[in-house]
Amino acid sequence: MKSLALALLVGGAIAAGPQQQVLQAPVDNPDVAEPPLQTIADTFDHLRGQATNLWNDVIDKVPNIMDTITHTPPPKKFNRRPDSEWNHIVRGAEIQAVWVEGDDGEKHRKVGGKLEAYDLRVKAVDPKSLGVDTVRQYSGYLDDNENDKHLFYWFFESRNDPENDPVVLWLNGGPGCSSLTGLFLELGPSSITEDLKVNYNPYSWNANASVIFLDQPVNVGYSYSGGSVSDTNAAGKDVYALLTLFFEQFPEYAKQDFHIAGESYAGHYIPVFASEIMAHKERNINLKSILIGNGLTDPLTQYPLYRPMACGEGGYPAVLDQASCQSMDNALPRCLSMIEACYSSESAWTCVPASIYCNNAIIGPYQRTGRNPYDVRTDCEGGNLCYTQLGDISKYLNQAEVMKALGAEVSTYDSCNMDINRNFLFRGDWMKPFHRLVPGLIAEMPVLLYAGDADFICNWLGNKAWAEALEYPGHAKFAAAEMKNLTIVDNKSKGKVIGQVKSAGNFTFMRLYGGGHMVPLDQPEASLEFMNRWLKGEWSAKSSS
């Protein structure tokens, strides 16, 4: 859903196995820690002193962590549909073989990138079959035939003017959460009721844009693979291939402006995916902006703001007592030193300990309260992911008639895959400094960070802090810009204050009042308001010049 496992995993919470809670309180019994400590010593005695010290700190905090590393999930069961059931199959090898003559008279490939291993299968979804929306729809798979990876997508055309409206790629986070939960829980054309009926959403983001919902990385949602993807950079290659082949099949959409939006762990994904696209000079992807909602992008700057958000300094009453707040303060210096070590080396040997230690010491106190980490105003209901609607969505998407209508090939749909979550963490991906890619993107396009102000796990305080700390040529102007009221301007709620915004050049930060981790769920009118205005270019270097 949201990128929801974010919290789960985030919590330090490495799930030692499917039967365990994602977040576990630190074990205080020193005897329990003895065997893992010996294992660490035996296995990593060749590491330099700093890495060994980091792992010792982790084992002290989470004694059973070694058991979780050795867990290997089974591959998803699937039944591949014959080619005859698909309306179109786009062969990456054929696209890669196309050469054109440039303005300089030299021949070059029509589009860049290694595409020969990829195919795109496309199914025209009958709008009447599911009733999710009346607009034109396509679903299907991107196949990486070399690595046995199959990414599922679902495209909805704009309700307004699809021949001219922009195209948006939506990504949930986790890592390991399906973007179809974003579709049905947040910003898609319909939601799912308790009796598994579709309920029209007047605030869907396809009101004025065509939207692609992508289940990535593999083994998330309807996507599947015999292997796995466990870091953001590897996932970026797949997303570039999917977009390239999709726009090759549908050139009528390729000519439109294209934007990437997502939330939570998409704060990792989006800088990488956008940078991957821009790295190809010859491309058919007309990328114009990126939007990150309640994201995790710069942990070193964001982690110090967990304590203020949990302890009453983020605009809502405190969730934690004074002792818990003090424990977070006490643990912060060590946490930050470990994140700094990760930033310095970007190695799993330093980044994994930082993730485990900081998530348990800094996020753990909040999660052990039973409060919703995605909304400080509510308790957690419906299991680890805290939203009962997720169960309804999973039941709906597991229906045979739904799977058939979409061409889904897996035996079951799950909203979030905790194995993926764990794999990303143990590759060190969690704490890596993906914010370092953002300055290069700001130089090329508008960048928006928006944050619902009731979220704990990727809270607005931390997102505002890293936005203001980011070093790039326009840093001083952005840091000095004032937060101004954000109001509705073009409907019956005209004049209603929905948040605050600060912007300078191509960089914008928004605080959305009353929104949790998933702003479109909690504040649908506000989310469509800022989205429509963003797509029109209201906050950009061009509009402010």
From Swiss-Prot:
It holds the Pfam family Peptidase_S10. Residues 1-17 form the signal peptide. Residues 18-123 form a propeptide. GO terms for cellular component: fungal-type vacuole. The active site is at 264, 455, 517. It comes from the Eukaryota. GO terms for biological process: proteolysis. It is found in: Vacuole. Keywords: Carboxypeptidase, Disulfide bond, Glycoprotein, Hydrolase, Protease, Signal, Vacuole, Zymogen. Glycans are attached at residues 208, 485, 491, 506. The keyword Transferase does not apply. Disulfide bonds join 177-416, 311-325, 335-358, 342-351, 380-386. Its EC number is 3.4.16.5. It catalyses: Release of a C-terminal amino acid with broad specificity. It is an enzyme of class 3 (hydrolase). Vacuolar carboxypeptidase involved in degradation of small peptides. Digests preferentially peptides containing an aliphatic or hydrophobic residue in P1' position, as well as methionine, leucine or phenylalanine in P1 position of ester substrate. Belongs to the peptidase S10 family. This is Carboxypeptidase Y homolog A. It comes from Ajellomyces dermatitidis (strain ER-3 / ATCC MYA-2586) (Blastomyces dermatitidis). The gene is CPYA.
